Amino acid sequence: MRRYVQNKVGKCYLPRLYCVTKDPRSIVFDTLPNKFVVKANHGSRFVRVVTDKRSIDVQSLVSECQGWLNIDYGQCYGEWGYLGLKRCLMVEEFVESSYKDKQGVPADFRFFVFDGKCALIWVDIGRPPSARNVSIYYPSWKQVPITLGYPPTEGPLEPPADLRAMIALAEDVARRIDFVRVDLYSTPCGPLVGELTMTPGAGMWRFPNKIDHLLGKKWKLSKGL
């Protein structure tokens, strides 16, 4: 993902990378800053956000990371994009943002992009132990009155100051792809790309009919699925 984004829009739109490894025991935690993120490249939810390095149990984290690497995630839900990947761990910078949960973890702005055009923005705030809140917006920032199993954010959420830049970045990254979800962070220095996924929710999310039809009409395929 990082190589694709770098080639498409430039390295400046990616969080700083500290380490890439196939063996979590090789991570030199003493050289890392107090805040960082560890994640695997071959599945969903394989991520650990560290906001205070002094409070972590290193051996427990190493064991957790090894557990991720042992899972053939592509076989779990039949997601072709994860099949056959050379599994690895990445240690990245902790991204600071004014849109964050109570632990300081930045919100995910998830852009549903069809052939280079943003159709929907899913704002996801909160990782355990914080509560998770999800609100969904059109690109105009009009809120879509639906929930998908999570409560919406409390009160109206102000659009990020760099919303237009975020939409433009998501569309540039997704250009010439029939569909991809582009996950961004809003930072004081501009948007950063956190993740790309071709099959959000393993393709099993149930949207209300109105939104399902809206998204379906925007998905133009030369051949049927």
Q: What name fits each language-model region?
A:
Residues 32, 55-149:
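Phosphate-binding site of ATP-dependent enzymes
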Residues 168, 186-225:
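C-terminal active-site "lid" helix and adjoining low-complexity regulatory extension at the edge
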Residues 21, 42, 93-95, 113-115, ...:
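Short, flexible loop/turn elements at secondary-structure junctions
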Residues 2, 25-28, 44-49, 57-58, ...:
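Short catalytic/ligand-binding loop motif for oxyanion handling, primarily in non-cytosolic enzymes
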